[in-house]
Amino acid sequence: PALMRALFRLGATYSAQELSYTKMLGQLQDAGNTVTVAHYLDLLDKAGMLCGIQKYDAKEVRRRKSSPRFMVYDTSLMTASSGIEKSRYLGEPDLRGHLVESAVGARLLARASEEGLGVYWWREGTKEVDFVVSKGFDSLSAIEVKSGKEKGQSGMADFLSAHPSAKRIVVG
């Protein structure tokens, strides 16, 4: 359907970025309601194209209530649907950052299904961690992706303080 196609384009454009369902509806024409959009996002996820990573919280209920962070399963889907030239991706730090973060996210998603991992993101106020990966109840890793330009404040110290058993990983 046209709405699913529009959702895919929107999600690929905003890969590695949080977007609430309300904002999605504002961006999509003939959006219907959030239930329909969430269902289409689930179908795109099952097709291995695009998913909405949930915000990490120890409580499952709060994870489900969070706004998703879009993530493509393959960065070629992101670049092909955007129409943005390679030189622009290389020249604009924000675009390059989203591309690099999407590449790391795509790899994590590929490993997640093979190894039974949970892939999330985390933010408290302005402090943020790009990815939180869990395996079972006893293994937690916080991953920060660096791509050249400093973005906001890293929340790594805050996350590790709240979750002292978590491992710290910096990519880039």
List where the protein language model places each region.
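Accessory nucleic acid-recognition modules appended to NTPase machines
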Residues: 1-139
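Hydrophobic alpha-helical segments
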Residues: 65, 88, 144, 158-160
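Short conserved micro-motifs at the rims of enzyme active sites and ligand-binding pockets
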Residues: 82-84, 144, 154-156
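A structural signal for isolated positions on well-ordered beta-strands in alpha/beta enzyme cores
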Residues: 120, 141, 167-170
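Active-site ExK catalytic segment of metal-dependent nucleases
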Residues: 139-149
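Catalytic cores of nucleic-acid endonucleases
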Residues: 147-172
